């Protein structure tokens, strides 16, 4: 595990404090100009942390296709339309944000987006789509996950419900899930990655 670098930790904490302060300023301004109740506020990160600190013991960090490199918190708020305090358990992607905004704002679009709207999950937090697959690619490494499993770049299957640290491969125990995700990964590699 990474040895704690006090200077980097201090810098990271200062950035969090600065971000918190400035998000507060934006919210105060929205309230001041009576725009807050009809403004969608989204907060998330683009990748996991640059060190193994603060990642809930997820495997690896930024620059990895494992959970520690790609799993991030995501907050969305819209006081007039989104019920506060809900927790979505559906695996989502950054690609889902724009289609969701289109649907939330009742706009119609003829564009076929790569992502999907997650508005239905905001309306019903217990809804789950176990067929949904999210692909991650970095430095010729590919992982694919669904709501329960991740198939890492080395083709090891992990049950994230029981093993969020990705320590115990379950390839043999869940061979049908392994085969399904491996097939999906190969198709994605040959149809998407091969274009770039």
Question: What residue spans do the PLM features occupy?
Answer:
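Beta-strand elements within well-structured catalytic alpha/beta cores of enzymes
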Residues: 16, 23, 40-45, 73-75, ...
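A long, amphipathic alpha-helix that forms part
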Residues: 1-39
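Histidine-centered active-site microenvironments of extracellular/periplasmic hydrolases
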Residues: 4, 28-81, 93
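Short alpha-helical functional segments enriched in proximate histidine and acidic residues
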Residues: 22-29, 100, 104, 188-191
């Amino acid at each position: 595990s990474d040895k704690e670098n006090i200077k980097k930790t201090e810098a990271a904490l200062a950035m969090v404090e600065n971000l918190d302060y400035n998000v507060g300023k934006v919210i105060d301004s929205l309230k001041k100009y009576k725009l807050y109740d009809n403004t969608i506020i989204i907060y998330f990160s683009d990748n996991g942390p640059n060190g193994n600190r603060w990642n809930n013991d997820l495997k690896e960090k930024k620059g990895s296709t494992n959970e520690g490199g790609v799993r991030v918190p995501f907050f969305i708020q819209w006081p007039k339309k989104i019920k506060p305090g809900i927790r979505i358990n559906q695996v989502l992607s950054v690609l889902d944000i724009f289609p969701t905004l289109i649907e939330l704002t009742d706009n119609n679009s003829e564009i076929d987006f790569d992502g999907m709207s997650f508005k239905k999950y905001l309306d019903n937090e217990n809804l789950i789509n176990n067929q949904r697959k999210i692909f991650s690619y970095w430095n010729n490494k590919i992982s694919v996950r669904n709501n329960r499993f991740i198939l890492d770049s080395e083709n090891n299957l992990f049950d994230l419900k029981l093993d969020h640290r990705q320590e115990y491969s379950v390839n043999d125990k869940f061979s049908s899930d392994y085969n399904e995700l491996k097939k999906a990964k190969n198709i994605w590699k040959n149809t998407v990655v091969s274009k770039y």
